Amino acid sequence: MCYNKSMTKVNEERVQEIFNSISSDYDKMNAIISFKQHDLWRAKTMKRMGDLTGLSILDLCCGTGDWTFDLSESVGPSGKVIGLDFSENMLEIAKAKLKEEAKKNIEFLQGNAMALPFEKGSFDVVTIGYGLRNTPDYLTVLKEIFRVLKPGGRVVCIETSHPTLPIYKQAFELYFKNVMPFLGKVFAKSLKEYQWLQKSAEDFPDAKTLEELFRKAGFVAVEYQKHGGGAIASHFATKSQKPKSNIRIGKK
């Protein structure tokens, strides 16, 4: 998950507590909740990203590092992937995986998504998977992503969304409000934590609204791809090569 400085101290502590407490079961629960479809959605998203060889990538809100490791394979030994997250327990698991994998092109850091510890124009690509909805100020996070991207750089975001077809919408609401918290209780003994995650998915904007937020943050060529009947959406956007200008040419 991602820390947001606009949270109250109580919320900050609560959110950190939630993700630290579910970290040991996080990978297992992702597979159970998505019926193992989360790997397929990520694979489809990465296929659309194209050739990443040699690129520098920031995997924001990296959690236990699943996407980070996939990205490291794609960039190869000449590329670099940094996984950043606020939860120390999530990062401990990610670092344990890294020790087993012995990847030399991955680095894991603890950090704040609202104030990224990187210079302007540091990365070719920024990814964020299922982390944006856990911050109350989505636009601020997107603006930070925009800042650390190089001109022409790309952002790719996978997040929960809201189906529009009635049958999918009803199934989505039933599943997220009732089934997902129940699965969290049964398999991870974490009913309250997964009720909180359900609420974050419920409150998160739909794919079209999120597209508009990307544009508001300064991105161009914003597109999205839906998965799971619209319950999940992958957004793709680009930081323009040309800086914006306030100068207007023409008659006054």
UniProtKB/Swiss-Prot annotation:
Keywords assigned by UniProt?
Answer: Menaquinone biosynthesis, Methyltransferase, S-adenosyl-L-methionine, Transferase
Catalytic reaction equation(s): a 2-demethylmenaquinol + S-adenosyl-L-methionine = a menaquinol + S-adenosyl-L-homocysteine + H(+)
According to the record, the segments passing through the membrane are none
The UniProt entry's GO biological process terms, in alphabetical order, are:
menaquinone biosynthetic process; methylation
Q: Which GO terms describe its molecular function?
A: demethylmenaquinone methyltransferase activity
The UniProt entry's sequence similarity note says:
Belongs to the class I-like SAM-binding methyltransferase superfamily. MenG/UbiE family.
Protein name as annotated: Demethylmenaquinone methyltransferase
| Record organism | Lactococcus lactis subsp. lactis (strain IL1403)
